[in-house]
Design a protein with these regions (language model features):
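Alpha-helical scaffold domains
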Residues: 1-200
């Protein structure tokens, strides 16, 4: 049903242009992001449970359709996700993390990061897991360590704990200097530029 809703909004001409822009063979429907966001908001309202959203997001991601993957990320992009029982928002975090090895381009990587960053801020102890990504051989997983942690670069008045987290992330950035991959360098400059705007 969710895929049917996305397909009704398909725009083949827009899809062709988007495929060329993103340089991808992945199926694209040509649905603008604001329309995807509106659909995701509606689905979230229909079933606000973590289990329901995680199940739908997982199914959408597995279609491999570009807009379906954007919608999957949008379903899990909110500051507060109240989970049932002791697991809390862990299923949402685990799902987003499971997407990392399947990422193959910056656009979907950034949508996944929007969802993941909120879960990371909700539970900063997950930085332990994120640190492991800095040693990954997979470009988009390694890049995710910087992009998921951007909220710490945006803080205007960081607490002592957040300053420690910021220093930790900056140490990862320092370790990326030797990596000549363009997307890695761009993620570092993005982080530093964001930080300098608030903490020159």
């Amino acid at each position: 049903r969710a895929m049917a809703a996305l397909r009704t909004l398909a725009d083949p001409e827009r899809a062709a242009k988007a495929s060329a822009y993103h340089k991808t063979d992945r199926e694209m429907l040509g649905v603008p992001v604001p329309e995807i966001t509106a659909l995701a908001d509606g689905w979230r309202a229909e079933d606000p449970t973590v289990a329901g959203r995680v199940a739908l997001a997982s199914a959408l991601w597995e279609t491999e359709v570009f807009e379906a993957r954007v919608a999957a990320a949008k379903l899990l992009t909110q500051a507060r996700i109240r989970g049932e029982g002791p697991e809390g928002d862990r299923p949402a975090w685990d799902l987003v993390v499971s997407w990392l090895p399947t990422l193959d381009g910056w656009a979907l990587a950034d949508h996944a990061a929007d969802a993941g960053a909120r879960r990371l801020v909700a539970d900063p102890s997950r930085l332990e897991e994120v640190e492991g990504w800095t040693r990954s051989d997979h470009l988009w997983t390694k890049r995710a360590a910087m992009v998921f942690t951007l909220p710490w670069a945006k803080l205007n008045h960081p607490s002592p704990e957040d300053r420690e987290r910021r220093e930790r992330i900056l140490s990862w950035a320092a370790g990326y200097v030797a990596d000549r991959e363009w997307f890695i360098q761009k993620s570092v400059s993005w982080w530093l530029r964001t930080l300098s705007a608030r903490d020159p």
